[in-house]
Amino acid sequence: MRNILKVTRFDDGTVQEVVHRDGLRVETYYKSEEGEARANLEQRPPAAADEARTYLSPSSSFSSSSSSSSAVALGARPDLAQGGGRGSERRERGCRWNGCPPLAIVLPVLANLIMCAMLAWYLNPLFSPWVYFNCTNSSLGVGNCSNFFGCSRGNLSVNDSFWPPGSVVFGKDGCAVSASVLGLVGPGVLCNGTGCA
């Protein structure tokens, strides 16, 4: 069944015919003096589940004086006025923040946090005022220190497993402690002016 919804004639002689046929809204454009259809745009109702492009069969012209001609089907688009809206266009363009899977948002943030944690871990000896260096043995000392160069000696030792591999920090009296290069196990290597113990 075909119901005519609207007929519009433009200044250039183009006629727009909007009809409702078999549950579809069809727009036909043609020149009134030529009787040639320009395009049929099929627009599915909003209840349609798929947004696949479909094509219309040739239709007859609106004007009774003009001869029937075939319509050039350009393809279907959802009716924006009937609820197709910008959400469907967003899905067609690709993933943005709305509609993305959670992993696409979480993974980059998690990767940045891991990189920041690794950087902070590597710089940990530079920002640990309670760690100082005992130049009499190959262990680290713990004390109430305001900075590396103003620490007092002590005999308390602590495992250096929280130190990153390869880090070297200079302490009081020109001493330096380097964590194990091969891993985060074992005591640190104590270096002074004469060598490393």
Swiss-Prot record:
Subcellular localization = Host membrane
Keywords associated with the record: Host membrane, Membrane, Transmembrane, Transmembrane helix
Q: What is its main location?
A: host cell
What stretches pass through the bilayer?
A: 103-123
Q: Which GO terms describe its cellular component?
A: host cell membrane; membrane
Does the entry feature the keyword Transmembrane helix, yes or no? yes
State the membrane topology.
Answer: Single-pass membrane protein
Specify the protein name.
Uncharacterized gene 27 protein
Species of the source? Equine herpesvirus 2 (strain 86/87) (EHV-2)
